[in-house]
Amino acid sequence: MVSSRRGFNPIAFTPWPVTILSSLVYLALIIPIIVVHHLVPPAPKESPAGVDLEEAWHDLQHLTRQYHPYNSHSNDEVHQWLLKRIHAISATSARSESQSGPEVFVFDDNQTNLTFSSAGVAATAITGVYFESRNIVVYIRGTEDEPGEWWKSPDGEPSGKGGVLVNAHYDSVSTGYGATDNGVGVITTLQLLKYFTTPGHYPRKGLVLLFNNGEEDFLNGAYAYSQHPMSKFTHTFLNLEGAGAGGRAVLFRSTDTEVTRFYGKSEHPFGTVLARDAFKLKFIRSETDYHVFDGVFGMRGLDVAFMEPRSRYHTDQDDARHTSIDSVWHMLSAAITTTEGLVSYTGDAFDGDSGDGGKLNNGIGTLGVWFDFFGSSFAVFQLNTLFGHSVALLVVAPLLLIITSVALFAVDKMYMFSMYTYISESGGQVSLYGLRGMFRFPLILGISTALTIALAFLIMKVNPFIIYSSPYAVWSMMLSTCMFFAWFISCVADFARPSALHRAYAFSWMFGIMWVFLVIATVYQKQHGIASSYFIVFYFAGVAVATWISYLELFGLPKTQDYARRQGRLSDRTPSSDSHFLAPSADELPSSSSAAGRDFNPEDVEDEEPTESTSLLRGQQRTTFANYASARGSQESNISNQGNNSLHPKDHRLEQKWSIYLMSSAWILQFLLVAPIVIILLGQLGLFLTSATYQIGADGGSQLVIYIGIAVLSVLILLPLFPFIHRFTYHIPTFLLFILIGTLVYNLTAFPFSHSNRLKLAFVQEMDLATGNNQASLVGVEPYIHDAVHAIPSVQDGKISCTSHGYGGRTKCSWPGLKPKVAEGPYKDWVSYNISQTKDDKITRFEVSGKNTRACKLLFDSPIADFHVQGSVVDKRIPHTGPKGVSEIRLWSRNWENTWTVDVEWTKKNSERTGKVMCLWSDDNDLHVIPELDLARKFAPWWVAITKLRDGLVEGSYSFEL
């Protein structure tokens, strides 16, 4: 007898196709996502026209030779070097004989000053600031700009289309060389000057390049720009910044959709709207000059910055050695594309009433949504578009399922949610087992999620800082935990109660869960302008279609009445005693041709409905769960000869008898509808969030949130596998079990820091100039702060005092330090001050100066009502006082050893007028100037990096009482 063998179906819903295909899809997407996230696109071997990458690299090396904070002599050297480079580039830019280049105007701003404050904090006293500008402003006149030098007139106003601003601050922190914060931004801006003064690249609209000084200490340079005439001319901006040390330059923030589209045309765009929402919701509290340009001036623009690793940020590893020419090119190429688009745009999108009184008339933008695909393409659309699609999906998707369900009931094919059906002729009851597996998915999801999140609490309890150097070990642990236990529970459930409706019920549960998530996301889109929930929209759309397909599959089943009649005829037969124990062989199953010639169905060879006399053993006897895979495999081989290709090959004969009619290949369509877009969007989001947060523990941030976030993201990334995971073979889950064990042991026992991921400890030395007593301090996290402090030779046991109050999750440990040598002469002469009062005692005048410094402070134990610095400008757009008063006044001068005259108005509640007069020193380029800092750098453990705590490395002060 010749058997009719069915051809092999490589996408059948059987263990090997499901295991292999789904694994390949995950690997094919996750690996490129990781590679793109960490590898920077290579710079071209030959510099493109208008730029010189070799020159840019040499400029970066020169710029980062020394620490150059605002309050240092090296900062003056950088200022002079920048002026020299700007004039050299302007003078040597190529010009054709037939066309002259654009006019270039260089403003060395040595006149602007401003008094302002940390406005916006109504519940507490604020910090007032007086700052004198050391900015350099370069204006490249656009080919369509109006001629003339309008800025020379006191009342001069620009005309025509607004210009474009590119900003980069050239000061560094006192403990970092500033290669990426913000050397690459400065070098990029210099190359933009070269590019837009090269023939063929002249800007149509005016371009202003701002090299601002003083960003690190309070965004001072950007605030001072508000008083420069060019601030009235620029309507859009591109801010270049660095909050890491190398890698790709990320689009941190953007004010609106319109400006973002120009960035989206970059060759290698990188970023997601999630970063903007994190700033908006105050999850990220540090700020860049973007805050001033957007919030104070009302300009429209973008914030492009480096973001990782944070362990090198503001340390001596922020140098040229730890970045690359590839990183320079990544920022430069994005800046060229974005700026070229902005200066070439002559439409009206950035002109007109902004609806915000007192700010620029640069039109009204629309909130946007954006994200990149593999660092090579960029999606940009309006938030209103996302909201519209969200609402449509919330309404249409449930209606579609309801209509489909009604249609299934109408044609008598709704097997889901059905326990029994009745034979209309005899009234007999036939079991459909349609509820089998209905509550399996929430059990699988709940247990696997709970176990994954439990690991987050375990790591926090035992080794909370392991993510600082080993984020991928944490990711591997979370993913393998979720995957293994989801598979294990699925297999146990499938072994005990096999169900052909597992897929349909799983997708139905996913539909309900994601629908709730989408409701929440839609509310936040509308009420709070939060766009980072875009992945939920795509997630729900894929799940909705996949769920609908599961419902459509039911139309291929026989009517429940027809099925009941067949079962009724089958029940009239008297089975042999062995029929309960032995499954039919392949030869006993009818071929499709023989089935057509007689009244026989494949269901006829299935197990009978259970009764009181039914054997406890199933037709296909399985002795142990260990034989799960081999039993499944034997079932699959036993039925390989039956049926035609259009029917389900009855892969698992213990499922419901009617399941033979279900499509065997529908699963692959469902999987491809959900998994790829989820892997891409959530994979990129997960890595972005990890890069932004995995080292915030050194700053006192909560790491539990990070671990729980990774756990939840792991579940969401693997969730598309849950409807199919019971079909997986044991091979990959077993391998993941070993990964789980290995990474768990590592994460619980490994030392959390490394040479490339050092723990940052913040240094400050406070000196009482009246007594000469000083306290050197390191601020960091427990328990590592104690190991670092005790490693310093000058620290004596018994003289260390530690406190955690007021340091945001960190501990400050102080000890008597070696006296600094930041100024000449006796330390009592380092700060000079004079205090005088008016006759009515309402105003007190402070005259303050410091040796070898241009930064001082006035600190008040009780907030004052107001203050005025002689010679200062006040801008009504930028308040310098608040409703709760001012507790601190920071004074910055462009000149060394300047004398500030400050008039202070006391509040009526100021019965005790006490405080401190303080000056700061931040220049640590010479050894032995701050010997205690030298010792900390030299003798602290290898896994420690020293950074600054406040504006000054050394603070010398006198107390006063009036």
UniProtKB/Swiss-Prot annotation:
Record protein name field: Vacuolar membrane protease
Kindly list the places in or outside the cell where this protein is found, as annotated in its UniProt entry: Vacuole membrane
Q: Identify the EC number(s).
A: 3.4.-.-
Enzyme class of the recorded protein, top EC level: hydrolase
| CDD domains linked | M28_Fxna_like
In this entry, the parts of the chain located on the Vacuolar side of the membrane are: 37-390, 462-472, 525-534, 689-704, 753-962
- Co-factor remark: Binds 2 Zn(2+) ions per subunit.
Residues in compartment: Cytoplasmic: 1-15, 412-440, 494-503, 556-667, 726-731
